[in-house]
A protein has these predicted regions:
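C-terminal regions of RecA-like/P-loop NTPase motor modules
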Residues: 2-42, 53, 129, 146-162, ...
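The Walker A/P-loop phosphate-binding site
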Residues: 6, 16-116, 325-326
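Hydrophobic/aromatic beta-strand patches that form the interior of the parallel beta-sheet core
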Residues: 66-68, 95-97, 139, 202, ...
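Structural recognition of the conserved hydrophobic beta-strand(s) that form the central parallel beta-sheet
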Residues: 96, 165-166, 199-206
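Cofactor-binding loop segments of dinucleotide-utilizing enzymes, especially the Rossmann-like FAD-
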Residues: 99, 206, 240
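Catalytic acidic motif of RecA-like/P-loop NTPases
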Residues: 170, 191, 208
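Charged helix-capping and loop-helix junction motifs
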Residues: 180-189, 218-222
């Protein structure tokens, strides 16, 4: 108590009466909290929360901050947009802000992913857009400052959003005199927003320039302050298989990889999504392939011959002027 009294004398602005704080003891354990604890114990760490679009025990816990990092153009945004569609099917709403893509590009990607059709007809894409209106909202703001991020989050909360995608951290206008300090401050406030607003927040970020684009980055390659990964609940690395892409382009798809590896280049995955930090659970690696329609739809499957996932199915009596995967 003497130490607390001393702190109050030194800096009274930082020491507030209990009545003015938001903190409180949760003891004795309430009936609702007891129920929540029981469900958590029964389900285990991995079974609480929203799933990924691909086969995995990983779950996005409520009120968590997630960082999605990787080399530029390796599929971070593609994977997250596909997640938004997957969550929509689960009855969860997502808000997206993208500095690198205009709104029409984000929606075009979502429509192609949702249908697994590279170029849907005008009627078809209008139906998908109407469905998206209920589940995925895109925030239009050409430039985002520190304080604008939280205006966006507050607006998302008012729209009953469950997941928020911020694409990307580098595009947010932070004061450059001490960029790492301001990045840390932003991550701290994002983590606080997760808890206070009940949101699951996903932040896209870059990794440092590696010796080769074929190298697999890890969490220590994430650009900027180490607190970005330290404070995040989960950190994902999305990496494209550039070597396979080059071999396939050169016509080596049917060739074996080496004398010790008898797989062919075409058998390798097109990409890899690695959970390199998981606060509640175990790290995991998910091999990804472009779906049967190909990269034009910007959607992944978790098996070489896995069927394309169709998130939106139109009326059965609708006519098509092209082949569709359902």
């Amino acid at each position: 108590m003497e130490e607390v009294a001393w702190m109050y004398e030194q800096d009274p602005a930082r020491m507030k009466p209990i009545s003015e704080t938001k903190g409180e003891f949760v003891s004795p354990i309430s009936e609702q909290l007891l129920k929540d604890i029981w469900e958590y114990i029964q389900d285990g760490n991995n079974m609480v929360g929203d799933t990924l679009p691909w086969e995995s025990d990983f779950r996005f816990k409520p009120k968590t901050l997630n960082v999605w990092a990787g080399i530029n153009a390796h599929g971070k945004s593609v994977a997250l947009q596909q997640c938004a569609l997957h969550w929509a099917v689960q009855g969860k709403k997502t808000a997206i802000w993208s500095q690198e893509m205009p709104c029409e590009t984000v929606y075009a990607n979502l429509i192609r992913q949702a249908t697994a059709v590279p170029k849907p007809t005008e009627m078809f894409h209008a139906l998908v857009a109407a469905w998206l209106n209920n589940w995925v909202m895109v925030w239009h703001q050409p430039s985002m400052r520190f304080e604008d991020v939280f205006t966006f989050l507050d607006a998302a909360k008012k729209e009953n959003i469950d997941h928020v995608i911020i694409d990307n951290l580098t595009s947010i206008g932070l004061t450059s005199d001490n960029l790492w300090m301001h990045q840390r401050e932003l991550i701290v406030h994002l983590k606080k927003a997760c808890m206070e607003l009940g949101l699951v927040i996903h932040v896209v970020h870059h990794v440092r320039k590696l010796d080769s684009e074929k190298n697999q980055p890890d969490k220590f390659d994430v650009v900027g302050s180490g607190d970005i990964t330290n404070l995040a609940d989960n950190v994902f690395i999305v990496n494209r298989n550039v070597e396979k892409q080059e071999k396939m382009a050169d016509g080596w798809g049917s060739q074996t990889i080496s004398s010790s590896d008898t797989r062919t280049w075409s058998e390798l995955s097109d990409g890899l999504k690695s959970a390199v930090k998981v606060r509640y659970g175990q790290p995991c690696r998910i091999k990804l392939w472009w779906n049967q329609i190909g990269p034009d739809t910007g959607a992944f499957t978790d098996g070489q011959h896995a069927p394309s996932t169709v998130y939106f199915k139109p009326p059965e009596d609708m006519e098509y002027d092209q082949e569709v995967p359902f």
